[in-house]
Amino acid sequence: NNFTIYDADDQKTLMKEICRKMNIDTKKVRERALLAQISHAKDELLNPDEMEVNAGADFNQKRAAQVYREYQAALRRNNALDFDDLIVKTVELFQNCDDVLQTYQERFRYIMVDEYQDTNTAQFKFVSLLASRYENLCVVGDDDQSIYKFRGANIGNILGFERVFPNAKVIRLEQNYRSTQNILDAANGVIANNTERKEKTLWTENPEGEKIHFRQFMNGYEEAEYVVGDIAKRHREGMADYHDCAVLYRTNAQSRLFEEKCLHANIPYKIVGGVNFYARKEIKDLLCYLKTVDNAADDLAVRRILNVPKRGIGATTVGRVQDYADMMNISFYDALR
């Protein structure tokens, strides 16, 4: 059967409906927070029942497990999967159907995995099952760069790789081609404090380069004021042109303070990057039309395009159709018919 893959916006819309039905106040418990708990459970290959057992007396975890159960039921009704399900369902298929597993083991005899330090438990299980027959597995990763535990990454996957695959050959790539030695020395000094890591020392044939300057600030406002002030000073004293300066930041939200300070100081700037193509409204609308054609049971897609372009259909009418669909236990599309 055809099925729809829900992206982050689809998941949030679905979770909002579930919270409404379960009388959960989304001002106190955010949809994103519940989805993150569910995603973490799927990363660990836990179903709703297992998550509830693990919750013990933790009220928040128990509630998340109950929401998880309703969330999965809603996905089934809509004939949809989320991104985590693509791995989880494949692992379940491989574990329960040996013939299917063998088919794909024959198809993919040689497997390569990049950024292995960022893999979660479900991904590790998936790769282990697929590679278990021929063990032609090459993974590339750096345990020192494992920073995504909050997203479910399990550093044990790379630290314990030789234990799971005892015949593996480990090749350390310690020469760096991008950075100066001063930058590498600083990095080596910081990461040496980590007691659970694979020993390695980065080095380069590049020049030593300039010394690193470290500044620490109480908040983002102080940081932006200092950085923009330093750029203005360098330009004023003829040390650098504006186009010689770049500010790197991890999240888009951080750019606002720097932009405000640049505007205040009359410093021209350019933001590199923009809205993701598939996150644009018109693209999502078009994709939902295609989803509806392919899978009319996808309520989220049907409701999104119902009034695109505008047809004078209000929220009250949509609500009545949804109530009828819920009462008759049919899809939103069938209720419209």
Where are these regions (language model features)?
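Proline-centered turn/helix-capping motifs that create local helix->coil transitions or kinks
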Residues: 26-27, 42-48, 190-201, 326-333
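Helicase P-loop NTPase motor core
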Residues: 166-169, 174-268, 291-295, 327
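Residue-level signature of catalytic and energy-coupling elements of molecular machines
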Residues: 15, 38, 82, 114, ...
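Conserved P-loop NTPase-based nucleic-acid remodeling module centered on helicase motor cores
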Residues: 1-37, 42, 46-55, 66, ...
